[in-house]
Amino acid sequence: MKLSDFDFDLPLELIAQNPISKRDESNLLIASTQQYVKTKFYNIIDYLKEGDLLVFNNSKVIKAKLSLDKNITINLNQRLKDNRRATNDDAGRLKSIDYWSAFAKPARKLKVGDEFYFDNHKIIITEKLEMGEIKIKFELANISVFEFLDKYGEMPLPLYIKRPERQKSDDERYQTVYSNIQGSVAAPTAGLHFTNDIINKLKAKGVQVAFVTLHVGAGTFMPVKTENINEHKMHTEYCSITPETAAIINKAKKEKRRIIAVGTTSLRTLESSGINGNVNSGDFETDIFITPGFKFQIVDMLLTNFHFPKSTLFMLVCAFAGFKKMHELYKYAIEEQMRFFSYGDATLLYRKV
């Protein structure tokens, strides 16, 4: 298929710039096989039933945006595996070493070996790659990289959120209420609509919940640049499924209960690990690229926000719910003035049979 097959006209005013006042008061579009139902998100309880299994991504967004000086900013992309360690400096003090990939703006102002100081901590540019990507080394005085980012970093809101300045409330609202494993540089946004109250009400109804981890990388915002979509190379992201979670999911599959992925990140994690209809536990990296024709093994329903034209995520939902159906659904959502992207509204999709 061609990239242009996944294009549609999106009015810019539908790109949500701020979260709605209450998480669960965003709109929810139910896209069953028979009809569309537009409701409020808190009514999702009415569309799930006893025995359903909701699978959330529990990754937590880190403050991944750093200002190296007044003219250069970087957005962390991914922690580089097997490279972090603790050592001692010349004075015998404990020093934390950590390596990450990042995207710099403007990258042309940086060269390998440049050093930037944050009090008694240091960032070193170790490598320059293409498309503004760099590799960096953290040398931190007796704190972890996440403690450093909490102190010096900013919440990495997407570029399409165009505000004069960040808001303190973003630290809370660009984070799911259940996130507890640090590592994402962008939010798994389908989960932003959930409150603890809704989760508790779902559990009381007999809906089961489970958690996987996928640390969202900055590559999630990278555009597809090849007209032949099969030539597109996906970024890799770290995933983890515990043995306990795998057992819960496989039991639900065996009992033919519905498995609902909360977000494309949960879906990509589950389908990446699926072999012969079962989920396998473990830590792994995925670069799965889901396009129409993909054979889904695990997920029956998908809760997700509305995605960019010509994006890999719009291709994913077309693969899941049907190419023609998704174009029709998005046309309806635009006519209904639904809000798009990270702080926008949600839709509940059923897998195409």
UniProtKB/Swiss-Prot annotation:
* Pathway linked to the protein: tRNA modification; tRNA-queuosine biosynthesis
* Position of the signal peptide: none
Q: Which GO terms describe its biological process?
A: queuosine biosynthetic process; tRNA wobble guanine modification
Asked if the Swiss-Prot or TrEMBL record annotates the protein with the keyword Acyltransferase, the reply is no
Please state what class of enzyme this protein is. Answer: transferase
Q: Which InterPro entries match?
A: QueA, QueA_dom1, QueA_dom2, QueA_sf
Q: Where in the cell does this protein reside? A: Cytoplasm
Does this UniProt record's set of keywords contain Transmembrane? no
Give the reaction(s) catalysed: 7-aminomethyl-7-carbaguanosine(34) in tRNA + S-adenosyl-L-methionine = epoxyqueuosine(34) in tRNA + adenine + L-methionine + 2 H(+)
Predominant subcellular localization, coarse grouping: cytoplasm
PANTHER family recorded for this chain? Answer: S-ADENOSYLMETHIONINE:TRNA RIBOSYLTRANSFERASE-ISOMERASE
Q: How does it assemble?
A: Monomer.
**Role, per record:** Transfers and isomerizes the ribose moiety from AdoMet to the 7-aminomethyl group of 7-deazaguanine (preQ1-tRNA) to give epoxyqueuosine (oQ-tRNA).
The protein, known as: S-adenosylmethionine:tRNA ribosyltransferase-isomerase
Q: Which organism does this sequence originate in?
A: Rickettsia bellii (strain RML369-C)
- The gene name reads queA
